[in-house]
Amino acid sequence: MHAELAEVAAAVSAAACIVGLRHARPGCARAFVAGALVSSVGYTCFPAIRHCVHMAARYLSYLCFVRGGATACVHSVADEAVQELVDSLHRVLAERDQCVLGSVELVQGSEPLVLGLPQAPVLCVPEPSGAVDPECVEVDLYCHENLRYESDVSEDEDKDDACDEGISLARQTLLDLLACSEDASGFSPPEDSFSSLLETGELYDEVLDASLARAEA
């Protein structure tokens, strides 16, 4: 550990000297070298300084590795959750003789939340009033507090009435879906409860806290 710190201090001192010489400020370079030496002596001789350095290193490791690992887990589980939502929508629409052609996007308020989600295509056609229309139209599915499908409305139709005919999937608890556990992929059918993945803006923090709590238990 001491050797590594000495190498880092030497590299920082060398860089500081180069910067100081480049700007014709040799005093600045000497100050950086003196600071590096004082820091090395302080780390070696004073336990309090050593403890602060260790805590800073642990915090950086936590941010870079622990939090990053939890985020990767959230990405994986969220992908499965969205795919399950899409599959559920397929089943519901099939029962109504409908299909959708579009994409799934998770949104929180007016801002999209990036979860590494696949652009899951869904086949879809508005429910025909008369004969079956073979043409499909593109629509987008948005998930906020629930997932809702709203068919396109022609100019002569009442948009509010058409929106009332949308398909709404219910929710289940956020952490049930995003707990990063072995049973995280066991989703409920759409007629029961299904999660709003974006119920909270502290998505990653909640998942991370839950993961750390299980690790400490």
UniProtKB/Swiss-Prot annotation:
Keywords: Host membrane, Host mitochondrion, Host-virus interaction, Membrane, Modulation of host cell cycle by virus
Highest taxon in the source lineage: Viruses
Localisation: Host mitochondrion membrane
Motif (LXCXE motif): 141-145
Any one annotated GO CC term: membrane
GO BP terms: symbiont-mediated perturbation of host cell cycle progression; symbiont-mediated transformation of host cell
Transmembrane regions listed in the UniProt entry: none
Function: Plays a role in the modulation of host cell cycle. Induces a cytoplasmic sequestration of host RB1 at the mitochondrial membrane.
Subunit and interaction comment: Interacts with host RB1; this interaction induces the cytosolic sequestration of RB1.
Protein name per its UniProtKB record: Protein MC007
Organism the protein comes from: Molluscum contagiosum virus subtype 1 (MOCV)
Name of the gene this protein is made from: MC007
